[in-house]
Amino acid sequence: MSTQMAQPAAQARTGGAAPLLPGAWRSGLGRVGVELKVFFRDKQSVVFVFSLPAVLLVMLGSIFRGQAAAHGLSVGTLFAAGLIGGGIAATSFQYLGIGIATERDQGMLKRLYGTPMNRWAYFIGKTGLVVVCTVAETMLLVAVGMLIDNLRLPTSAERWWTFAWVFVLGTVCFSLLGIAISSIPRSARSAPAVIMLPFTVLQFISGVYVPATLVPPWLRDIASFFPLKWICQGLRSVFLPQRAVVLEPAGSWEHGRIALVLLAWIAAGLVLCLTTFRWRSSRDG
C-alpha cells in the first residue's frame, strides 16, 4: 500500500510522466483525434493560427510588390521565406505555450492527471495536433507566397531534403520550447502577453518581418542565439535562388550550423520540459 501511494507522489515531482509503453501510443493516437476536434471547433483559434501569417504575407507582399532587394530578388520573396519560418514557429511554440498554460489554469491538466490515461498520451496528442497544423500552415503560406510574391518551389532533391530536415527540426524544437514556456504564465489571462511579447520581438530581429541585412549587428548577434533565425535562414536557402546567399550576413547558408543550433535547442527544450512541466496550477500547489 505504501509503495502504491508513493508512486503518484514521485510522478508528481517528475511531471507525472509514466513510461512510454505501447498502450501510450494507442491512447496518444486517440488523443490526436480529440485535440483536432477541439481545435477545429474553436473557430477563433483556427482563424488566428492560420490567417494571421497569411494575412501578414499578403499585406507585406502587396506593399513591397515590385521593389527589388538585390540581385534581381524582390523584397516580397524575402518576406515570404521568412514568414514561412515564422509560421512554423508560431504554430508550434505560441499555440502550445498559450494552450497548455490555459488548460493548466482551468484545471484540465489536473483532471487528466487523475485519469488512468498514460501521461505520454497527452503529449502525443499535442504533437499530432502541431504536426497537422504546421503542415497545413506551411502549405497555405507557400501557396500564398507563390500567388503574391512569385515564390517558387524547390526544383532539386537536395533542396527538398533541406526543407524536410529544417521543417522537422524546427517543429520539434519549438514544440518542446512551447511546452516548456507554458509553465511560466501564472494564469490563462497572462499567458498570451507572457508568451507573445518575447516571440514577437524575436520575429523582428530574426529575419521574419525585417530582412536580416537591415537588422543592426548587435541585434543579429542576439537573434543568432535563438533557433528562429536559423529556421528562417534554412528556409531562405530552400525557396530563394542560390545568388541570394550574398544577402546573408555570413555570405553562406551555413546548413551545418543551422542543424547544430536546432539540435542543441531540441536537447535544451527536452531538459526544460522534463524539469519544469507541471500538471497543476500554482493555486493547486
Where are these regions (language model features)?
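Aromatic- and glycine-rich beta-strand/loop motifs that create alpha-glucan
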Residues: 2-52
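Short hydrophobic, aromatic-rich alpha-helical segments embedded in or entering the lipid bilayer
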Residues: 2-7, 26-30, 208-248, 255-256
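Junction motif at the cytosolic side of a transmembrane helix
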Residues: 2-13, 239, 249, 256-285
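Short alpha-helical transmembrane interface motifs in multi-pass membrane proteins
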Residues: 15-18, 45, 77-81, 89-94, ...
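Transmembrane helix boundary and interhelical loop/hinge segments in multi-pass membrane proteins
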Residues: 39, 92-117, 127
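Hydrophobic alpha-helical transmembrane segments of multi-pass membrane transport/permease proteins
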Residues: 41-66, 76-95, 136-137, 197-204, ...
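Transmembrane helix segments
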Residues: 59-67, 182-229
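Alpha-helical transmembrane segments and their short interhelical loops
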Residues: 119, 123-196, 200-202, 255-263, ...
